[in-house]
Amino acid sequence: MIYLHKILPALASPLGLCLLLVLLGLLLNARRWVARGILILTVCALPATSNVLWRQLERGHALQDPSDAPTAEAIVVLSGMLRAVPSGDGFAYEWSEAADRYFAGVDLALAMKAPKLIFTRGAQPWSAGAPEGEVLFERARRDLVPEGMLALTPPVENTAQEAQAVAEMLSPKAKVLLVTSAFHMPRAEDLFREAGLEVTPWPVDFRASANKTTMMDFIPSAGGLSGTSTALREFLGRAYYTYLK
């Protein structure tokens, strides 16, 4: 099932749609389908397009100071901020764009906003090395978070499983500070509430740019395409859990 959840969004991504339309155009000898595919890819590769989508996804959220956070039973940091890279005879871990999730969780823990800091053992079948939460657990110890505060979920593959795993670790209707990327927060918040938890969202890792729009935002780029693809995948995820789940 996890493979299906990854493959279907890829087919519906800008690049996937472009390739399908170009292939259809070549098979039918219809240039208009090729042109449509190229047009979709071009528009989606504009930084301006990705920024509009990010703003929509992150609407209603803002960065907050840890001192302003309410107290809770647990701080929950969702996986999705590490990547394994080759290193010598094995591999090592590096931060991805979502690294703010970890640092925000640690800041809340050190501010004593909850007695427990939970990392999720997020991993995919193809992931190298230990589940992400185990790596973050050890890093938090080095960052002086008391070991007695730290906890790990069982292995999980997606946000729905993370929510269920955390709910099983806490008391019914427990209050949690939920830390994840701003664009991912609405879907995560809904899933954690469905699992029976009282959620205070703590969004980080904002992707929308506050810079003024310039002509550079209307020049297609790999970064623009990547941003648009990620944003559209999140829209698809929200639609799936809203209408199909």
In which residue ranges do the predicted regions lie?
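Hydrophobic residues within the alpha-helical transmembrane core of Major Facilitator Superfamily
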Residues: 23-24, 42, 239
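A structural signal for short, hydrophobic/glycine-enriched beta-strand patches
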Residues: 47-222, 228
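Hydrophobic membrane-insertion alpha-helices, especially the h-region
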Residues: 35-47
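Membrane-embedded alpha-helical segments of integral membrane proteins
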Residues: 1-27
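Extended, histidine- and acidic-residue-enriched regions that form the cofactor-binding/catalytic faces
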Residues: 15-17, 47, 245
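Structured C-terminal subdomain patch of bacterial secreted/periplasmic proteins
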Residues: 220-245
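Hydrophobic alpha-helical segments of integral membrane proteins
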Residues: 3-8, 49, 53-57, 232-239
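Membrane-interface helix-boundary motifs at transmembrane edges
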Residues: 27-34
